[in-house]
Amino acid sequence: DARYVREWLSAQAASGYVQYDPASETFSLSEEQAFALAQEGSPAFIPGAVQIAVAQFKAIAKMAAAMRTGLGLGWHEHDSSLFHGTERFFRPGYAANLVGQWIPALEGVQARLEAGARVADVGCGHGASTIIMAQAFPASSFVGFDYHAPSVEVARASAAKTRL
């Protein structure tokens, strides 16, 4: 509802969390706020971390039972917001660092990938890192592995969208 959104934004502006321009009657975020809260590709994007926290709260009863019984809690037993949040949280860091910083820091790895290597991404989740590497190193072959079938389905769909 537009009225509720305006009231909420007005409260945020009164608290100094957003800016209000009375001339245009618009609200805005600072560049830094937008970088962290609204630009999904930014390396500082934090809403994925919020999804992870929400999933942890949803799992409190399961975690308590796991601690009481010693039976553990499988990755697959978590709320789906954990899997989506994990991908949203880590993907920007992978995009910003994996190809440009981390791989070059590993002696000889970049040259092998450029020449054509076979790579297994174990625990690939939604496939963000696998896709980033496959796009950067087309001479190499990348296969993602994960025991969580719904995550593998998301990874396959993402790979198909990028035509990998």
Where are these regions (language model features)?
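Generic recognition of stable, solvent-exposed alpha-helical segments in well-folded globular domains
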Residues: 58, 81, 128, 147-150
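Class I SAM-dependent methyltransferase "Motif I" SAM/SAH-binding loop
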Residues: 123-127
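Short, flexible micro-motifs
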Residues: 73, 128-130
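Class I SAM-dependent methyltransferase SAM/SAH-binding core
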Residues: 118-120, 130-164
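Key DNA-contact positions within bacterial/archaeal DNA-binding proteins
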Residues: 3
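Conserved Class I S-adenosyl-L-methionine-dependent methyltransferase catalytic core
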Residues: 6, 10-117
